[in-house]
Amino acid sequence: MADLLPPLTAAQVDAKTKVDEKVDYSNLPSPVPYEELHREALMSLKSDNFEGLRFDFTRALNQKFSLSHSVMMGPTEVPAQSPETTIKIPTAHYEFGANYYDPKLLLIGRVMTDGRLNARLKADLTDKLVVKANALITNEEHMSQAMFNFDYMGSDYRAQLQLGQSALIGATYIQSVTNHLSLGGEIFWAGVPRKSGIGYAARYETDKMVASGQVASTGAVVMNYVQKISDKVSLATDFMYNYFSRDVTASVGYDYMLRQARVRGKIDSNGVASALLEERLSMGLNFLLSAELDHKKKDYKFGFGLTVG
């Protein structure tokens, strides 16, 4: 009988597709966290470029606890009177870390040779409520920081409450409107500088692309677009504008996943081109190669590193 039926016309196919894609508002997916709206673009355009030598070693003592050692040697930029001038001084740092991983608890601590202490905590109180805490303790007066986040994940929305030092209070909310579109907003108030702000954001994603935008009362406008060429190749672009300072920056980049390596690179409107290569030499041994060229300042950065463990 199926062979005797006439084939569907183009209009019938389009109508059938629209019916199949009808939005079920009672079963919308959970959106990404508000602070991760641009995560795909950041992975391609904000790679961890460095200058000099970097060596990271991690040793697992058991399935949940591990120790890490990091050595960084290279020049550090210091402020100069002219924005087009770069001043670098040679520096070296050692960092000791301890990590505790559990399905419902994450503890990370880092101690630097200059006396700084970084601590991070993430605890899943329930399947939907997560508490996060970040702290920075330094020897410098009024430079220590602390932040607490309370994240709640609903079936089709996410909400977050932020509490920090200097009477900082913030809240974010993001809601899935369709299977592909999510809308959100944020508010914050800082007691000491007497500042407040509000922002709005939108994110649209499919299997092949991700587009996101964000605007805030501080004057910041951010737009990102990522096109997934294949499972291994992604192209990304972003646009950042500040209404008050009139600063504009745009960049394009790529993210290429090879069988044993990952290559990321970008170039922006300020004339800065950068690339980062991460290659797996063997199990537990990775090689890093970083390069950055600033045509405007006539400055360059080159670094290589090893990651063990």
Curated annotation (Swiss-Prot):
One of its GO terms (cellular component) is pore complex. It is found in: Mitochondrion outer membrane. Transmembrane segments: none annotated. One of its GO terms (biological process) is protein targeting to mitochondrion. Induction: Up-regulated after antimycin A or rotenone treatments. Accumulates in the mitochondrial transmembrane lipoprotein (MTL) complex during phosphate (Pi) starvation. GO terms for molecular function: porin activity; protein-transporting ATPase activity. The modification N-acetylalanine is found at A2. Expressed in roots, flowers, young cotyledons and leaves. It is a multi-pass membrane protein. Its main location: mitochondrion. The modification N-acetylmethionine is found at M1. Belongs to the Tom40 family. Central component of the receptor complex responsible for the recognition and translocation of cytosolically synthesized mitochondrial preproteins. Together with TOM22 functions as the transit peptide receptor at the surface of the mitochondrion outer membrane and facilitates the movement of preproteins into the translocation pore. Directly involved in the pore formation. Forms part of the preprotein translocase complex of the outer mitochondrial membrane (TOM complex) which consists of at least 6 different proteins (TOM5, TOM6, TOM7, TOM20, TOM22/TOM9 and TOM40). Present in a large lipid-enriched complex called mitochondrial transmembrane lipoprotein (MTL) complex made of proteins located in the two mitochondrial membranes, including the TOM complex and the core components of the MICOS complex and containing at least digalactosyldiacylglycerol (DGDG). Binds to MIC60. This is Mitochondrial import receptor subunit TOM40-1. It comes from Arabidopsis thaliana. The gene is TOM40-1.
